[in-house]
């Protein structure tokens, strides 16, 4: 009975991809890969399984979100929870040279366990890039501009990119709060976009009215270059001023790339990915309640693999991207040749000729069809090769 109960069920958070959605994913994948390669990035693949002690702990994904298992030697493994940490491992061990910035790309599924069924997948596909070895703001501008180019190539014309700097947030919190423990509480409110909770917590802190106002003013630091001047007035530390200057340089570069119209500053932007060290960003689209992609600078991650190097990159969620584009049946037009046994050779010859021309063709024996009317609805056209030659129907 228990076996029958789960006959059609899937593990928590897992999804099937039906033909029409698979075809749409394939087209999005192909289009984006072509654009990424035009920018000089090279694709890489990494194992689905990684060691927990290395990639698992470096990934910045909460431990309870990891799928863990043991190999036959007793080592703890994880299904990769993201692609940045595995690529950092490969780059640090086999590819990266100090004098040579590295441009890598990926298209892979990642895995994050769900505690309950809330509509979020435990396995999802990401497409993204990593630019390793370039610590300049120009590298951040490049990956953001590439991300915008990819979205436009797949037909997403309306999107917005929120850009912030984790160094700025950390500098402001350290100035006012004095320790990491108190700062982490406020960062969590910001990550969860719980601005009501943030305001209430700030008002409960034993701070002067001036410092409370500084923390509350952080939420209003949004928009264009004018927000940078307001941000600089809010902090006094060198780290905070430098972070604001980096954002100013980023906006100038993005204007040159022609994507500044889609970019808006959000100085309160915080990520759950703890390895981000500088500029970070999220991209949003209409009709989608979550970011369809995110990225940022992670200058300390490769040091965990004993090869310090600056790096930046992004990942786009394919499922959310397709939701933003709008699901449409993009299966190519398929033709079907229905044949009887005596016309088999003729049917095979016709199918091979059409396939050689790039057409998609199905060969189907007439006796294998239960309902010819229902079956024919699946195809653009039907060619019938039935009976003796000379008695075709279409």
From Swiss-Prot:
SUPFAM superfamilies: Class II aaRS and biotin synthetases. Keywords: Amino-acid biosynthesis, Cytoplasm, Histidine biosynthesis. HAMAP family: HisZ. InterPro entries: aa-tRNA-synth_II, aa-tRNA-synth_II/BPL/LPL, HisRS-like_core, HisRS/HisZ, HisZ, HisZ-C. Disulfide bonds: none annotated. Belongs to the class-II aminoacyl-tRNA synthetase family. HisZ subfamily. This is ATP phosphoribosyltransferase regulatory subunit. One of its GO terms (cellular component) is cytoplasm. GO terms for biological process: histidyl-tRNA aminoacylation; L-histidine biosynthetic process. It comes from the Bacteria. The gene is hisZ. Its main location: cytoplasm. Heteromultimer composed of HisG and HisZ subunits. Pathway: Amino-acid biosynthesis; L-histidine biosynthesis; L-histidine from 5-phospho-alpha-D-ribose 1-diphosphate: step 1/9. This function is generally fulfilled by the C-terminal part of HisG, which is missing in some bacteria such as this one. Pfam families: HisZ-like (PF21996), tRNA-synt_His (PF13393). Gene3D superfamilies: 3.40.50.12590, Bira Bifunctional Protein, Domain 2. GO terms for molecular function: catalytic activity, acting on a protein; histidine-tRNA ligase activity; transferase activity. It is found in: Cytoplasm. Required for the first step of histidine biosynthesis. May allow the feedback regulation of ATP phosphoribosyltransferase activity by histidine.
């Amino acid at each position: 009975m228990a076996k029958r109960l789960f006959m059609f069920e899937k593990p928590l958070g897992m999804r099937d991809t039906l033909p029409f959605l698979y075809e749409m994913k394939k087209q999005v994948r192909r289009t984006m890969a072509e654009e990424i390669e035009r920018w000089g990035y090279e694709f890489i693949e990494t194992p689905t399984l990684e060691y927990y002690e290395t990639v698992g702990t470096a990934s910045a994904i909460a431990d309870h979100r990891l799928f863990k298992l043991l190999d036959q030697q007793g080592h703890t493994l994880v299904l990769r929870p993201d692609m940045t940490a595995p690529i950092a491992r490969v780059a640090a061990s086999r590819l990266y040279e100090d004098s040579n910035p590295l441009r890598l790309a990926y298209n892979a599924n990642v895995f994050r366990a769900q505690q309950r069924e809330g509509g979020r997948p435990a396995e999802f596909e990401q497409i993204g890039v990593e630019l390793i070895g370039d610590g300049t703001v120009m590298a951040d501008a490049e990956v953001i501009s590439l991300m915008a180019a990819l979205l436009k190539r797949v037909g997403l014309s309306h999107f917005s990119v929120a850009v912030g700097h984790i160094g700025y947030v950390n500098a402001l919190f350290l100035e006012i709060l004095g320790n990491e423990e108190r700062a982490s509480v406020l960062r969590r409110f910001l990550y969860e976009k719980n601005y009501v909770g943030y305001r209430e917590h700030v008002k409960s802190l034993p701070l002067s009215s001036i410092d409370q106002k500084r923390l509350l003013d952080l939420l209003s630091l949004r928009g264009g270059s004018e927000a940078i001047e307001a941000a600089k007035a809010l902090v006094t530390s060198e780290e905070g001023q430098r972070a604001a200057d980096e954002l100013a340089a980023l906006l100038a570069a993005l204007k040159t790339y022609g994507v500044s119209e889609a970019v808006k500053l959000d100085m309160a932007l915080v990520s759950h990915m703890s390895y981000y060290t500088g500029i970070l960003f999220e991209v949003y689209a209409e009709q989608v309640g979550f970011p369809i992609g995110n990225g940022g600078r992670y200058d300390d991650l490769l040091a965990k693999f004993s090869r310090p190097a600056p790096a930046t990159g992004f990942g786009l969620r394919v499922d959310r991207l397709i939701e933003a584009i709008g699901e449409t049946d993009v299966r190519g037009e398929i033709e079907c040749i229905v044949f009887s046994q005596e016309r088999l050779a003729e049917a095979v010859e016709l199918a091979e000729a059409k396939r050689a021309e790039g057409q998609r063709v199905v060969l189907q024996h007439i006796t294998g069809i239960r309902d010819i009317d229902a079956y024919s609805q699946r195809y653009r056209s039907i060619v019938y090769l039935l009976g003796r030659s000379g008695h075709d129907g279409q």
